[in-house]
Amino acid sequence: MDEKYYIGTDLKFLINIEAEGFSMDSDDYEIELRCNSRSVTVHKEDIVEDGEDHYLCVDTTQFGSGMLQMVVYAYVPDEHFVDDHTRTEIAVVNLCELRKTYGG
């Protein structure tokens, strides 16, 4: 994962998803952000494509103050169980480092 920038309440970072069975082209997936015991599901319209890269744009105010770290999960279809998804951790974003680096 390669962080791009953090300015104010807008967080944008490149997501490299290599979770087995996960495809950005599939409609059958969800991405979940967890921070400060809060959870937000990311919808397909929150994913911005730039060539072959995919960026995730997030309004971080929904997590409240004092954020330290955000974990990004992908839910991928489980081929062994119908209507079941496997949660796979795909990224950990250190929000303090982003703020320090980009002055948010």
Mark where each language-model region is.
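Contiguous segments within soluble domain cores/interaction surfaces
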Residues: M1-G104
